[in-house]
Amino acid sequence: MVREKVKVSTRTLQWKCVESRRDSKRLYYGRFILSPLMKGQADTIGIAMRRALLGEIEGTCITRAKSENIPHDYSNIVGIQESVHEILMNLNEIVLRSNLYGTRNALICVQGPGYITARDIILPPSVEIIDNTQHIATLTEPIDLCIELKIERNRGYSLKMSNNFEDRSYPIDAVFMPVQNANHSIHSYGNGNEKQEILFLEIWTNGSLTPKEALHEASRNLINLFIPFLHVEEETVYLENNQHQVTLPFFPFHNRLVNLRKKKKELAFQYIFIDQLELPPRIYNCLKKSNIHTLLDLLNNSQEDLIKIEHFHIEDVKKILDILEKK
């Protein structure tokens, strides 16, 4: 087997596409590299990019169907080969491309007999179908079938909650994910202490975006998430009308500390010295320097007080709690 070779930059950080193909109208593949990276950077970028590719990119889907011909979504209609459930599943698989915001309406209005495909959907100007041949239903008799559709642009998943039988309107599970899969791998090269890394990114899309477009959009979304950290922190924040205040949760071990105080008796605490707790030397020395000599002294300090002690960490609170809960 011949091993593939790629040319990479050894000084300037660069990316390039090393493979791109279209397997079908609804399956695109792209492979990209980014180099040179220092040890550990490739994994950091790869994990972030994969999550952004799968979760941060918006897609367009049919989310609702309405028809006077449909009594309920598990029924069969005379003159139509497929069940209503099968038609809704077929609509769920239609791949759309758009730059719309909010929702739009579309329509299918066909007279049988004949096949209904994605080509028969009457779309708003801002939406296009990726594969016009996608099957929707088969009309076996000369009947009229009209289905009103709702189209939305969003990200992630939208699972149908309930059916509205009164207006013959049925929600459709939507997967707003143009990227079907994304993987990353790392290749190290170089000698000794000068080892560097190449990040390989593989992206599969449904055709509504090319892998290169998906890579650009995921990168922009990540940049937008990190931009606020580049700004100087405002000491005084004035809330606008569209903002609200939230109560911050306690630190993770606060509840355990409170429960421990309730379970133990204070009288016993004052006679238990921290020397008896078999604490790690560093934690023991930190507590001693802060005049914490007994278990009562220790539990009279809140978690916030403890982590203010010099060289004391939040992990140390966890260690102390683990030891005390075993006593």
From Swiss-Prot:
Alphabetized UniProt keyword annotations: Chloroplast, DNA-directed RNA polymerase, Nucleotidyltransferase, Plastid, Transcription, Transferase
Domain notes: The N-terminal domain is essential for RNAP assembly and basal transcription, whereas the C-terminal domain is involved in interaction with transcriptional regulators and with upstream promoter elements.
Family listed: Belongs to the RNA polymerase alpha chain family.
Region (Alpha C-terminal domain (alpha-CTD)): 265-327
InterPro entries recorded: DNA-dir_RNA_pol_insert, DNA-dir_RNA_pol_RpoA/D/Rpb3, DNA-dir_RpoA, RBP11-like, RNAP_asu_C, RNApol_insert_sf
Segment forming the signal sequence: none
GO BP term, example: DNA-templated transcription
Principal subcellular localisation of the protein: plastid
Protein name: DNA-directed RNA polymerase subunit alpha
Positions of the UniProt region annotated as Alpha N-terminal domain (alpha-NTD): 1-233
HAMAP family: RNApol_bact_RpoA
